[in-house]
Amino acid sequence: MRLILLSGLLLLGIFLANGHEQDPDGKVLNSLIDALMHLQREFAKLRGAFLTVYKARSFGNGSERLYVTNKEIKNFEALRQICEQAGGHIPSPQLENQNKAFANVLERHNKEAFLVVGDSANFTNWAAGQPNKAAGTCVKADTHGSWHSASCDDNLLVVCEFYFIL
């Protein structure tokens, strides 16, 4: 959408730079201005619709972050690449409600998934006896949202985390 707006501005700039000899009544200029205003209104509607969906999804799962799966089963490195290409991140729940939203996805699919635990995390949800470095250097969550050490070579449900700064 921004590309369309920029294209409209570019056309307007070219028209203004060429002078008005070919459009003495300003019809072309007015047409370009009308088209640009229409695009701005459409962009505002699209942005509003996006924000409505985002807020509804956030409200529904009790978290400002969205956890989405493509239902594929992959190892940690493949997950990292998939999430990055999709514009998301490997899940990293920082609050209990975020972990619950993440666990809801896992429970619906009856699968485990990788997550990333930050060094300065204020929230953790390790299962009893975890972390266990002997099990691996990655972390997975079970269908209840409990965290376990895991091998990064395990193949688990692909879940990516998306959040927006508005």
From Swiss-Prot:
* Taxonomic superkingdom: Eukaryota
Say where the protein is mainly found: secreted
Q: Which molecular function terms from Gene Ontology are attached?
A: carbohydrate binding; phospholipase A2 inhibitor activity
Keywords (A to Z) from UniProt: Calcium, Disulfide bond, Glycoprotein, Lectin, Phospholipase A2 inhibitor, Secreted, Signal
Q: What subcellular locations does the record give?
A: Secreted
Cysteine-cysteine disulfides: 83-160, 138-152
* Any Pfam family matching the protein: Lectin_C
Task: Please give the residues the UniProt entry marks as glycosylated.
Answer: 61, 122
Q: What does this protein do?
A: This phospholipase A2 inhibitor binds directly phospholipase A2 in the presence or absence of calcium.
The record's family statement is: Belongs to the alpha-type phospholipase A2 inhibitor family.
Complex formation: Homotrimer; non-covalently linked.
Task: Spell out the protein name for this chain.
Answer: Phospholipase A2 inhibitor
